[in-house]
Amino acid sequence: MKLKFKKQAYQTDATSAAVNLFAGQEKIASTFTVMEERQLSLLQNEYGYGNALLIDDKKMLENMQEVQRRFNLPLTNDIEDKRFCIDMETATGKTFVYTQTILELNRRYGFTKFIVVVPSVAIREGVKKSLDATKEYFSQA
């Protein structure tokens, strides 16, 4: 059985909110295996290697507050930890949204490293099934 996926406005809004946090970020053209030494120094911190964030905290705060205004959320000033949350109800397509967000972050900004944490083996297996089911859809997007 082949599933058909339909764009949902709330899912597109969630992806847009996450991606727009990084507005102004230059696209980094790199891969995990082939990097210039100059690029590696941009990615390294005390935790290891990650995506090179080239926008400053002030710009990220402006971006975050713009997203908050767009969705009528209370404005906050705390981006010190750079932890952002998109809350979605059960069975609303969270896996679809974060997969779409990952692909869009890669397309726009060249981000290539993502960590997805799930609370149990059962949910991990559900995520794997969802990724398998959406593989064709996202490869055509």
Mark where each language-model region is.
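RecA-like P-loop NTPase motor core of helicase/translocase proteins
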Residues: 1-141
